[in-house]
Amino acid sequence: MTRLLLLALLLCSSAHAQYPAKPVRILVGYAAGSSTDIVGRVMADRLGAYWNQSVYVENRGGAAGNLAADAAAKAPGDGYTLLFAQNGLAISAAALPNLPYNAERDLSAIAPVAATPHILIVAADFPAKNVQELIARARSEPGQLTYASSGVGN
């Protein structure tokens, strides 16, 4: 039994040592230059140096990251296609029931990579200087304020 276990461990470590034997693609579901893209490229550079192998980012922007997630879900499960995603992946699963993939079934999270802040910003000359003032303004002028977001349902 011990010999079989040792043999199995040696075979596994041999297979592990050979990965990656070819370039690794990281799918990013947002445009080049976005914060997700920038962090993804830093990660690709570091993984490439660590593995001594080419690791590149492929941007598949659109549909709040769902185009890239769908491509990752349909890629072979060989480790040569990775998805760099953010919280939109979980939000999409809850908000969009007819996605062409099932994140829980088709994808597997392997590591948290970065934490980025989400901040609310207004133009410098906008009268509201805090959230309470912004809420008061929105209530006093229903339907007059707009916002921009890269998220689901934007």
Regions found by a protein language model. Name each.
Residues K22-A31, V55-Y56, T81-L82, S108, ...:
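Short, well-ordered beta-strand elements
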